[in-house]
Amino acid sequence: PEDSIPFDESIQTVDDINLAVIGIYDTFKSSSLYSGSLTLLPDLQTDLVYGVNGNTNIYGEIWRWKDILATNTSIEGVYAALYNVINRCNFLLDRVDNVRKNTTNDDDLDLIDQCCGEAYFARAIAYSELVKLFCKAYESDEDAANQLGVILTRHYKGNEEMKRASLKDSYQFILDDLDLAAELLALDKDFQPTGKDALYNTAAFFNEY
């Protein structure tokens, strides 16, 4: 678009970083994620959902557990929305050092760290959902090293190879992001313990394997 901001001119201030984090949270409000398909579709596959005569067959293939193709628009929407979250996180993390090097106020530096911690946590959540939905279960380190994981990207504008990593590497990527989030969020004296509980609960889910 003609009014778009070039990458190298974006996120210049601490306020910009804070707004970028708000944008990440806003992306989670997608109708394909927790307020829509990501919550609805698994519920439709439970034993308590029944198809009735005269139904319109909306979500029919999901309910039947068959003929679920990669071109299913609901599933495409979930996949795209999760990577949209990841891209926003990568965008912020790629630009944050430019602001940090020009910031001298300690409170502002702490806020930058907090925002980065939230971005790492958001990226870990998005990748954890992708792994849960599109990968096989983690049986063992040896097996996971030979199973397909998800496409891992650390940068918004990079020359990273767009191919699926191993399941083992995908899990490790998520755990590394959670470790970074825990380290950075711990620096914020106002960070709520309930938020940290959510972080460690996510980490525990992956560490149990």
PLM features: what roles do these ranges have?
Residues P1-Q45:
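Membrane-proximal, proline-rich intrinsically disordered regions
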Residues E9-D16, A70-V85, L111, A144, ...:
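Extracytoplasmic/periplasmic, Sec-exported soluble proteins
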Residues T39-N72, K157, T202-Y209:
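A structural signal for short, hydrophobic/glycine-enriched beta-strand patches
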Residues I58-F134, A165, E183-D188, Q192:
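Conserved, well-structured interaction surfaces
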Residues N102-I112, L133-F173:
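Short coil/linker segments at helix-helix boundaries
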Residues Q114, F121, Q147, D169, ...:
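Residue signature of alpha-solenoid helical repeat architecture, marking inter-repeat boundaries
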Residues E118, I125, A198, A204-F206:
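Residue register of alpha-helical TPR repeats
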